[in-house]
């Protein structure tokens, strides 16, 4: 018997599509839902979580224990989540700050995002949501939820599609940049890691086309999500910024994508802001404006 063909990975870039993807994943959960978030103030998300619990779904939410605004703001978030009936766990590593943004429903699909579940990110930011049915990604995120919830080391056998900060992020991003053959395009207003900046300089000298968009705006949207496109064939979307703090001292999750239709959508995003017009070897410090 042949295995059923899984749906192709999708990348959602428009504000309405991003929010709909999150809502649909929660609504589609039948028995269990794992959600990892940093911020959430969207009433619709809270309603959907409560509805999932009401229909018998086991909902677990993993959240940060440290954020700007202090404990009062976090307690309000925890209270709102607990009111839905979800079981809430706080990530309590004494050094590593929690910033991962993903969700898994049942045995799939899984969602990896660059955005927070906030009214602002659902309306005013340049962000991306990746939806995947890849069983290795689904299983890996399930494992990661369990280990982070229990305060133990993450699994060592995660699919290489997942980029995990701080454990593997530096090595994986270094490999992506080192192995690029023709182009490296990035949207990352916070990009500042010295080692990766030096590596991009080296690749630029090798003749690789490099463009880093560091403007505070991406078209009409506020720059927030971190998106990388390598050789027009591999993309990375997730919570990571290419800063030393984000790479080395935060729980972050990003996902690598090669699905052609998803790559085409990401390429269209870069084209819409003129990034592909960069000449080989160029790396504008801030395409379209001053650095954030």
What do these predicted ranges mean?
Residues 289-292:
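Terminal interaction modules at protein C-ends
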Residues 1-28, 36-179, 187-270, 274-275, ...:
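HKD-type phospholipase D/PLD-like phosphodiesterase module
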């Amino acid at each position: 018997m042949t295995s059923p063909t899984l749906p192709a990975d999708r990348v959602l870039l428009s504000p309405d599509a991003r929010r709909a993807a999150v809502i649909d994943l929660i609504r589609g959960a039948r028995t269990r839902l794992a959600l990892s978030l940093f911020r959430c103030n969207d009433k619709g998300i809270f309603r959907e979580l409560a509805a999932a619990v009401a229909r018998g779904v086991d909902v677990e939410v993993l959240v940060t224990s440290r954020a700007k605004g202090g404990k009062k703001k976090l307690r309000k978030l925890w209270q709102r989540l607990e009111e839905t009936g979800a079981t809430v766990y706080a990530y309590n590593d004494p050094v590593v700050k929690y910033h991962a943004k993903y969700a898994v429903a049942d045995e799939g699909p899984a969602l990896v995002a660059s955005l927070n579940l906030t009214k602002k990110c659902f309306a005013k930011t340049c962000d991306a949501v990746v939806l995947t049915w890849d069983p290795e990604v689904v299983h890996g995120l399930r494992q990661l939820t369990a280990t982070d919830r229990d305060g133990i080391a993450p699994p060592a056998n995660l699919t290489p599609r997942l980029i995990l900060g701080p454990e593997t992020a530096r090595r994986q991003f270094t490999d992506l940049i080192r192995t690029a053959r023709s182009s490296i395009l990035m949207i990352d207003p916070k990009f500042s890691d010295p080692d990766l900046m030096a590596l991009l300089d080296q690749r630029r000298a090798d003749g690789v086309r490099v463009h880093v968009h560091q403007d505070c705006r991406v078209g009409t949207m506020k720059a927030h999500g971190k998106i990388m496109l390598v050789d027009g064939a591999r993309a990375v979307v997730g919570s990571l910024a290419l800063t030393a703090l984000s790479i080395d001292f935060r729980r972050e999750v990003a996902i690598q994508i090669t699905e052609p239709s998803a790559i085409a959508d990401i390429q269209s995003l870069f084209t819409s802001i003129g990034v592909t017009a960069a000449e080989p070897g160029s790396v504008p410090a801030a395409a379209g404006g001053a650095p954030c």
